[in-house]
Amino acid sequence: MRSSCCDMCSQEEFQAQRSQLVALLISGSLEGFESILDWLLSWDVLSREDYEGLSLPGQPLSHSARRLLDTVWNKGVWGCQKLLEAVQEAQANSHTFELYGSWDTHSLHPTRDLQSHRPAIVRRLYNHVEAMLELAREGGFLSQYECEEIRLPIFTSSQRARRLLDLAAVKANGLAAFLLQHVRELPAPLPLPYEAAECQKFISKLRTMVLTQSRFLSTYDGSENLCLEDIYTENILELQTEVGTAGALQKSPAILGLEDLFDTHGHLNRDADTILVVGEAGSGKSTLLQRLHLLWATGRSFQEFLFIFPFSCRQLQCVAKPLSLRTLLFEHCCWPDVAQDDVFQFLLDHPDRVLLTFDGLDEFKFRFTDRERHCSPIDPTSVQTLLFNLLQGNLLKNACKVLTSRPDAVSALLRKFVRTELQLKGFSEEGIQLYLRKHHREPGVADRLIQLIQATSALHGLCHLPVFSWMVSRCHRELLLQNRGFPTTSTDMYLLILQHFLLHASPPDSSPLGLGPGLLQSRLSTLLHLGHLALRGLAMSCYVFSAQQLQAAQVDSDDISLGFLVRAQSSVPGSKAPLEFLHITFQCFFAAFYLAVSADTSVASLKHLFSCGRLGSSLLGRLLPNLCIQGSRVKKGSEAALLQKAEPHNLQITAAFLAGLLSQQHRDLLAACQVSERVLLQRQARARSCLAHSLREHFHSIPPAVPGETKSMHAMPGFIWLIRSLYEMQEEQLAQEAVRRLDIGHLKLTFCRVGPAECAALAFVLQHLQRPVALQLDYNSVGDVGVEQLRPCLGVCTALYLRDNNISDRGARTLVECALRCEQLQKLALFNNKLTDACACSMAKLLAHKQNFLSLRVGNNHITAAGAEVLAQGLKSNTSLKFLGFWGNSVGDKGTQALAEVVADHQNLKWLSLVGNNIGSMGAEALALMLEKNKSLEELCLEENHICDEGVYSLAEGLKRNSTLKFLKLSNNGITYRGAEALLQALSRNSAILEVWLRGNTFSLEEIQTLSSRDARLLL
C-alpha cells in the first residue's frame, strides 16, 4: 500500500486513493500519526490552527485521518505530495534524528526554529522531558500547574515533548529561546528503546515464558501433556459482519486462518482496539489463543508485536487487591529483571507493539460496564475496572486486545468497543478426520474411528466441537469394542468419559467392562465430592479452586487422582497452583450429577436450576415453573440457594445434563448411586412434566397471527437449550406431548448458533408437529452433517431456509433426496453456502420429478455455466416452479442462454434473479427472446452485470412483445443515456411494466432529471 500511495502525483490520483490513505494513516499507533503531523508542521504545510484542529484529544484516529486528508487536499498538489513525504519520514523512524540546517542558539525567531526542527526536537526530548520541565520551572518559564498538565500520566513521553513545544509556541516569556538553547545541549538520541539491551532482555524473557506455557496442551487432560505442535487442528473461524451491509451480493462470512486474525477487513468499529472471538463451550477458544502464543514465541508469526501478555479471566477474577496496569503486566504476567521503569515507559509509548489476550470473559464474574473510567497506567484500581478500561481503550489505547468468550456473555454494550468479531465454529468435516489422525498414528485405528463416527449420525454431529472429538479420541477403545448403544446425547458422551476415567483409576484385575453399578459405587463418594465442589463453584462464578475450597468440599488427594481436576497456572507468583476442572462443561456435568443423585437435593429445589431471577423473561426464567412450592423459603446454603447465584450460560449446560441424567435410559445408573426408587421416580416425573409444560408456555407466548398471514414464531433466547434438554431425555412421548398443541406456520431460528448437535435435537422434537411448518435456520452452522441430522423432521416442513450455513454439495444432495420423498416440502433456500456445479444434477432431478415444488434459491454460491445448463434440463420437465434465484454465481452468457431457452416456455415461473452473474450482451439477447415468448414471468433481476447499451437494446425489443413482466432491474450495468432511450421507446408500447431499475449506471445529473421526467417508471 505504501508504494502505491507514494507514487501518486496529482490531486485526482490522491483522491482516488483516499480509502487506502485513511487505512495507512490509522494502521499504526497514534504516535505514528502525530509524527506525520510533526513533519507537516515543520514544513509549514499545516498552520498552527490546522495542527490544533487535528490534535484535539479524544478524537477517533480515523476521524483525524480524514480531516488531515481534507486539509492537505485544500492546499493543492504540493500539500498532497508533502503528506506522502511525511508518511515516508514517519515510517522510516529507525534512523537517528539530527538537528539540521542553521542553528543559532540566539536566534531572533526561536518559535519558528522550534517548529522547523520539531521532529528532531521531539525525538531529542524523548528521555529528557522531566528534566527540561524542572529547568524551565526553576527559570520561571513554566508554572507548577503547567508542568503538572504536561506530566499527566495519560500522555506518552513523545506527547509530553509535543505539549511542551506547543506551549512554547504561544508563550511570550522566552520559553522558546530557552528550549532552543537547552535542547542543543542534550545528548544525541539513543537507539530506539526496543533495541536497547534492557528491552531486548525483557522480550527474550517474555518469549521464553509464553513458549513454556503454550508448548503443551493440557486443557482437557491431566494425565498427559500433548505437544500442541503435534495435535493442533485448525477450527472454522468466521468473520462476523453486520447483516445486509453488502447488499444483494453479500457473501457468506469469510472463513479465516489464525494468521488472518489481525487483518484490516470486517471492522465493526475501526477506532476500537479489541478483537472478539466467540464460540460455544468446547469449541477451542483457549487452544486457539495458545496456538497464537506459540507462533509468536517461536518467531513464526505475529512478529509485529514485540510483547504478548496472556491472561485468563477465570484467574484474574481471583485477584482481590487493587492493582495498576503496571502491576497487571509485570507482577501477574512477566517481571522485567532490570530497568522496569524504562520497559514500562516503552510499553506506554509504543502500544501498537503490544498484544494482550484475555481468555474466557464468560468465566469472569463481573459484568462489563463502561461507567467507571480509569485512564491512569500507574494508579491502582479493581481488576474488573482495569480490564474493562483496557477493552474500551482508556488504557493502552492502540494496543491490540484479543478477547474470547461464549456468545451469551457478550453484551451489546461491550460490542460497541469491538473492532472485529469472529466466531469459532469448531471442526469442519476434514478437521475431525485430521484431529483423529494426529491423535492415533497406529495403523488402522484412526480409520476405524472415522468410519464409526460417520456411520453414527448423532456421534458425528457432536464431534464438530473439539471437546467431543477429544472424548472420542480418549475413549476410542471403548467405542471400537462396542457393538451397539453408541453415544447419542451429550450426557452419553460425558458418562462415557466418566467410565473411561473410572476404569483408568481402577486396578486392572478389578475393572468391569462398562459403567456398571459396581464401578460407580466404588467411587461414589469421589463423584459427590467433585459434584459439590462444582456446584458451589458455579454459584460463586468460581472455576479455579484453592486448597481451602477443596477442603471445604471434602475433596482429597484420592478424589483429585481420578483426573477431572488439573493444575491451573498460578495467577500469583510463588503461591501454590490451584486446581480447576478439565473444562467448564465438566464442572457443569458434575454439578448436574450431584443434583441428580445427592440425598440433599429436594424435588422443589430443582426449580431453581431453571428459574434464576436474573434470567428475566428468557426461557430459563419460565422453565419448570410448577416445581415451586408456594410459600417455601430458600434455605441459605442449600442447592436451591446456590443455583440462584449461578451464571445463566452455565445453568443452561447444567440443565441439559440434568435432563439427560434423569432420563429413563440412565435410570439404572442413578439407582446404583443409592438414589431410592421413590425419589428417582419423583425427580424424573417432575422433570418430564415441567419440560413439556415449559415448552407449551413458550409456545403460548407467541402473539396471534396478523390477519391474512401465517402465524410465525421467532425463537426466544434459550429456546434451543430447552429443545436440547428434551433431546437429552430421549423420550419420544415427552417430545410429542411438548409440541402437541403448537399451531404455527413459520418457525424462525436465525442466529441461534444451531450446529449439527442442535439439529439432532430440533429434529427429535419437531418431527412430532401436528401441522406443516416452514423452518428458517439462516445464519447458523448447520453444515452437511446438520442437514443429515434434520432428516427426521423434514417430512413436516413446507419450506427450509438454510442461508449462510456452510453447506456443500454433499448437504445439497441429502436435501434433494429427502425433498423427493417429502410431499409437503416445496421451498428450498440455500444461498450463501458452498454449492458448486457438482450438485446441479441433484437440483435438476428435484425440479424434474417434484411437480409441486415452488421455490429454489441458490444465490451467492459457486455455480457456473455448466451447472446452469444441467439445471436447465431439469427445469424443462418442471411445471410448478415459481421462484428461481441464481444471483451471485458465475453462469455467464452461456448459462444464461440455457436458462432463458427453458424459461421461455415455462408457464408458472414468476421471479428470476440472475444478479451478479457476469452476463453481457449475448446473455441479454437470450433473455430478450425469452421475454418475447414467456407469459408468466413478473420480475427479472439483472443488477450487477455488464449488459451495457447493446444488451439493453435487445431487452427493449423483448419488452415490446411482452405483456406480463412488471419489474425489470438493471442497476449497475454500465448503461448510458442511449440505452435508457431505447427502454423509453419500449415503455411507450408496454403498459404492464411498473418499474425499471437503472440506479448506478452512467448518467449525468441532467440526464437523470430528463429521464425521470419522461417516464416515472424509470427508477434512477
Swiss-Prot record:
Gene Ontology MF terms: ADP binding; ATP binding; CARD domain binding; enzyme binding; muramyl dipeptide binding; pattern recognition receptor activity; peptidoglycan binding; protein kinase binding
Stretches forming LRR repeats: 685-709, 726-749, 766-792, 794-817, 822-845, 850-873, 906-929, 934-962, 963-985, 1005-1019
Entry GO terms, CC: basolateral plasma membrane; cell surface; cytoplasm; cytoskeleton; cytosol; extrinsic component of plasma membrane; mitochondrion; plasma membrane
Residues holding ADP: T219, Y232, T233, G282, S283, G284, K285, S286, T287, H583
Result for mutant: T212A: In strain: NMRI
Subcellular location: Cell membrane; Basolateral cell membrane; Cytoplasm; Mitochondrion
BP GO annotations: activation of immune response; adaptive immune response; biosynthetic process of antibacterial peptides active against Gram-positive bacteria; canonical NF-kappaB signal transduction; cellular response to lipopolysaccharide; cellular response to muramyl dipeptide; cellular response to peptidoglycan; defense response
Gene null: resulting phenotype: No visible phenotype in absence of infection; mice are healthy and display normal lymphoid and myeloid cellular composition in the thymus and spleen. Mice are however susceptible to bacterial infection due to the inability to detect bacterial muramyl dipeptide and trigger an innate immune response. Deletion mice have an altered composition of the gut microbiota with a net increase in the abundance of bacteroidetes and firmicutes phyla in the feces and terminal ileum compared to wild-type mice due to the fact that they are unable to kill bacteria effectively.
Major localization listed first in the record, in broad terms: membrane
Lipidation (S-palmitoyl cysteine): C375
Effect of substituting G485V: In strain: NMRI
Domain CARD: 6-104, 106-200
Biological function: Pattern recognition receptor (PRR) that detects bacterial peptidoglycan fragments and other danger signals and plays an important role in gastrointestinal immunity. Specifically activated by muramyl dipeptide (MDP), a fragment of bacterial peptidoglycan found in every bacterial peptidoglycan type. NOD2 specifically recognizes and binds 6-O-phospho-MDP, the phosphorylated form of MDP, which is generated by NAGK. 6-O-phospho-MDP-binding triggers oligomerization that facilitates the binding and subsequent activation of the proximal adapter receptor-interacting RIPK2.
The name this protein goes by in its record: Nucleotide-binding oligomerization domain-containing protein 2
Species of provenance: Mus musculus
Lineage of producing organism: Eukaryota, Metazoa, Chordata, Craniata, Vertebrata
Gene: Nod2
